[in-house]
Amino acid sequence: MKRVEVADSLRGFSLIGIFLANLLIFQFGLSGQEYISYFHLNPVNYSVGILINIIFVHSFLPIFAILFGFSMDKLYQSMKTKNIKRPKLKLFRRSLGLLTLGFLHAIFIWEGDILTSYAIAMLILIPFISFKIKFFKWVTIIGFILLSLLFIGSFFDSTNTEPSSHEKATYVSEVTQIYAHGSFHEIQNIDNKVKDPGLEMIKKDLGDSYGLLLLFSIFINFPLFTLGIYFSKSNWFEKNAKQFWSCKLFIYMIPIALIGKSIMYWSNHNNSTDGISFLSGTLLSIGIICLFKKVYQSHRQNWIMQNLKYMGKMSLTMYIMQSIIGTLIFYSYGLGLFGKDILLSVSYTHLR
């Protein structure tokens, strides 16, 4: 089965966005990315951090999740076309391999792993992968409706979800000390040494269980995986990007999504702003996919698109390499630049 090149190019593009989003985590920590004002950055780097947060954080990982579901179905279709026996079993083996790699990545390389949750989602989806397109269409619609209701409910909850200034300052000081000067063992066990105020807030709602947190992460991403499968079964990427309801509408909504994502910077931080920001991030992801599809259909032979395509074909390798490079730049067992005022220079170097 012929590869869908626009999907490969989009995957490469999403990897760049993911690296820029993860750059904040590499440099400031999982919750520290939201407290960059406590790192005393110069005005230019601080502004770059805010822009990365609005445009890339929680906007490009959903694209990667959609493409993961898309690729999973394409792989299944390819095996069926080639009359390969027990294709679901082969998908199951691949998911176990990805799960193992995800565990190793999370334990020995970087705590911000996404491979583990992707592998678990794949295990859940395998029994249904042979179902018709209508199944995935309605699962996706119902999934997004449930998520919307979940976060719309937060609009009526004005509870403050922002940790205190003292909690933020303490967290920033402790993680900087460990990531910039601690041993490899201390970095790998930082969750046992430092209380992440953002994670503590989530634990209050979901309970002190990492398994439950992982399942919640899979739940909020599940409609993205099924949307990707729907895109595959409907040949969505091959269709004209000028169609209004399936593409152009979401491009027009990109500015609205950006305003929604920026709400945390011009409004009080509470459950309602968290909900608006999350839903806006998902909307922005779909808008970016549609915009990229439109640009690709007009400039598919452009050298940028071709290079993104090659990057997308090596997405797993590129993702692991990003983690290795990011930790070696910022953690103490590398250059130890965690928390330093160099955000703009690293972003510029990567984009080059």
Residue ranges and their predicted role:
Residues 3-9, 249-254, 296-325, 343-345:
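Functional transmembrane helices that form membrane-embedded active or gating regions
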Residues 44-111:
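Membrane helical hairpin/interfacial module
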Residues 80-89, 129-135, 234-245, 299-306:
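Membrane-interface helix-boundary motifs at transmembrane edges
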Residues 142-223:
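Long hydrophobic alpha-helical segments that form multi-pass transmembrane helix bundles
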Residues 248-296:
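Alpha-helical transmembrane segments and terminal signal-anchor/GPI-anchor hydrophobic tails
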Residues 349-350:
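Conserved small/polar residues in nucleotide/adenosyl-binding loops
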